[in-house]
């Protein structure tokens, strides 16, 4: 028995959503298992790390830093390069999440944690020990931007990568950048999910005035 065209189109996002969620979950679990065997893996910085409460505070502040950093980056993209706002990459991912809400876990939780492991701990953390903050931050941020395959907005991703690196460097705790990254992805997902209903609501308010 074959699916109809409509049924096939509806099934595709669901399949993709579950695949993304499960693959990210497995990758995260494997990463945690492998890194737990090396006690020195997280000891990138010498000296005292930031306290847990201040780590959380810096993580929340970091979200706002990234948010405003993206606003500045978007303004530069528009003014200098004529690039319009909005990301097709983000829109595609959110479309999958709407078809399979399980994918939200990958977008908001699993993905950010994995990306912080790879780009901040592995790439930035390795380079900062042999070079300096700026070299490590710029290189890791560029790789972070490239891996998203949204080259029209590479400046925005690079800015995010630089700020995440700063947060990790400032507090000496990877959880700081993870908190900021999770909050950013969660905020973007929430806005994308409710952008259309919110727009309709505002239009109705205008009609009532």
Give the predicted meaning of each segment:
Residues 56-72, 76, 109, 113, ...:
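Hydrophobic, lipid-facing residues on alpha-helical transmembrane segments of integral membrane proteins
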Residues 1-38:
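Alpha-helical transmembrane segments in multi-pass membrane proteins
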Residues 17, 21, 55-60, 101-105, ...:
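Hydrophobic alpha-helical transmembrane segments
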Residues 113-118, 122-123, 150, 183, ...:
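Active-site His/Glu-centered metal-binding helix of metallohydrolases
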